[in-house]
Design a protein with these regions (language model features):
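Acidic, heptad-repeat coiled-coil helices used for dimerization/signal transmission
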Residues: 1-226
Length: 226
């Protein structure tokens, strides 16, 4: 049915979000070594404190700030991705339990009851637990919607901060042009930055899209199940 389809899609989106989260952290960790390579290149191309050295230092400082922010929502204990996954997983479990309890009640209403079981008492208990599962699932889904929105906002903020790194990267490319005869090592480092920047921005966009999809799925379920 429609509700089952929504649950399956939510679970699929959560798995994709976890994959993007892990890949994003790996890309950003790999990115941290490039400013060090730029400094090594600078030591061969210019006196201490030259433009390439300044570019590498500025890039390093900016990327560390972004890395700290990134880990606050996709890395470390209690991050936003983990919170969203936990709330949705909790809701999915409760919703599954609710559906099983509902089927048990329907089966009990249809089938003959053993003489040693008071079905009316059992039915009331099952119905009470079913309602509790529904209420707790709705609470978890509502919380999940809020966390998904926070994750989407944080992803957008990181993408904006990446524009600052893009500016520094462009300055590095300008220096490559100025040192075209001797800046081969610098050019290779900037090429690596190009690759990682594209990858990171793409994964941030994917996380934003997935968090919005998850949020929309939870809202749809709450509306249809009401």
């Amino acid at each position: 049915d429609v509700l089952t389809k929504i649950l399956l899609e939510l679970n699929d989106s959560l798995e994709k979000a976890a994959t993007e989260q892990n890949a994003l952290l790996r890309s950003f960790d790999a990115l941290q070594s490039i400013p060090n390579n730029m400094r090594l290149v600078a030591s061969r191309l210019e006196p201490s404190g030259g433009p390439v050295s300044a570019i590498s230092e500025n890039y390093k400082a900016s990327s560390v700030g972004i890395s700290d922010r990134l880990r606050s929502f996709v890395g470390g204990e209690g991050n936003l991705c983990e919170q969203m996954s936990r709330e949705v997983a909790h809701a999915l479990f409760l919703l599954g339990a609710e559906r099983v309890l509902k089927e048990m009640i329907q089966t009990g209403d249809r089938e003959p009851t053993p003489a040693d079981i008071d079905w009316e008492v059992e039915r009331k208990l099952l119905e009470q637990v079913r309602r509790e599962c529904t209420a707790k699932a709705c609470t978890a889904l509502t919380s999940g919607v809020e966390v998904a929105a926070a994750l989407s906002r944080s992803s957008a903020d990181i993408r904006r901060q990446m524009l600052g790194l893009d500016t520094i990267r462009v300055l590095g490319r300008v220096e490559c042009g100025r040192m075209r005869e001797q800046g081969g090592g610098l050019s290779a480092a900037i090429d690596q930055l190009d690759t990682f920047h594209d990858d990171i921005k793409g994964r941030l966009a994917a996380l934003m899209g997935l968090s919005e999809t998850i949020s929309a799925g939870m809202v749809s379920y709450l509306r249809l199940a009401a």
